From Swiss-Prot:
Organism: Haemophilus influenzae (strain ATCC 51907 / DSM 11121 / KW20 / Rd)
Keyword Transferase: yes
Primary gene name: aroA
Subunit annotation: Monomer.
Name under which the protein is recorded: 3-phosphoshikimate 1-carboxyvinyltransferase
Database matches in CDD domains: EPSP_synthase
Keywords per UniProt: Amino-acid biosynthesis, Aromatic amino acid biosynthesis, Cytoplasm, Transferase
Active site, per annotation: 316
Family the entry assigns: Belongs to the EPSP synthase family.
Compartments reported by the entry: Cytoplasm
Amino acid sequence: MEKITLAPISAVEGTINLPGSKSLSNRALLLAALAKGTTKVTNLLDSDDIRHMLNALKALGVRYQLSDDKTICEVEGLGGTFNIQDNLSLFLGNAGTAMRPLTAALCLKGKTESEIILTGEPRMKERPILHLVDALRQAGADIRYLENEGYPPLAIRNKGIKGGKVKIDGSISSQFLTALLMSAPLAENDTEIEIIGELVSKPYIDITLAMMRDFGVQVENHHYQKFQVKGNQSYISPNKYLVEGDASSASYFLAAGAIKGKVKVTGIGKNSIQGDRLFADVLEKMGAKITWGEDFIQAEHAELNGIDMDMNHIPDAAMTIATTALFANSETVIRNIYNWRVKETDRLTAMATELRKVGAEVEGGEDFIRIQPLPLNQFKHANIETYNDHRMAMCFSLIALSNTPVTILDPKCTAKTFPTFFNEFEKICLKN
């Protein structure tokens, strides 16, 4: 297995231009495909998850032109639903941001009735999709499971989504609601969506609603408990769509600045629509010095205090707090993160296991993790398992800010969202 060893880093300094956001990139491509008109999507992320969406759209008859560096994509909108070849099978890797929205969009009524299969990597077949399928079936969709009940692969017939009143469980993943919301305007009737349980990761729903607005569709949001969407609408291309820099990817660089120097990230700022921009607020609560601009966020070192906080609103960036916590002067507790368990891997178990390897004292619960700080000279050199999870690899690069090297196994797993991560991280590092 490939591995990379990061030598101890004495300080960090510099500016990082962030790659485009994964969440925004895949939403933008799907909305552009369904819209009337041509959309030029700029600052698109070049990564595995985006490639899976692009390959799927091509197979579904969407025409697009991708620039040589794969960051600009001109998409010719279909002005409505997909025309599906019968018995087409789409392989979506481990890309939840492709699997969930496409599951809903492919239920919409096509010109001719066809069946399509959605599948992916072995881990994708372990990631739940039951709540989305249940909600779509309530709205009249025709979906069946091909292997295990509640999980991909799926067979979908494009008979249409009728709309009406739909209840959806919001407690596992906000992507289920995102998928339903993005397809609802093309349903045959109006849709009223009621959320059962607590809706997780609300800021990701804000991203979805803002992007639907950019493509000409309004949704009535009643305190995240009920959403009303008019049916029989069309998305309208905004002609150009700029993808913001990835706020989740920003977290590793901002944390490095807070721990040991000063780092600025560009491509995201105080008006960002991404919830993970709030990661900088968490660093500030811990004591770091944060500066916000229109198009940048900067984090500067100060003494860091532990924190006890509900981080349900920033589940991806919360992982970065888990490794940052080792450099604080008191205990950190990250709460209400059950949905870590249904991500690329069971992140709660993985995080606790790997933190212990570097010498940390950790308590992992069903939906929380408690982490004790670790003096710089007590870190152990460990081989970090990444579980084919891009965020595990990136989070644990911060361990090199101690007096100890860290070895990351399978570093290429960052290709899911940030193929050049380790090159970029190296740029801000001053070695001993």
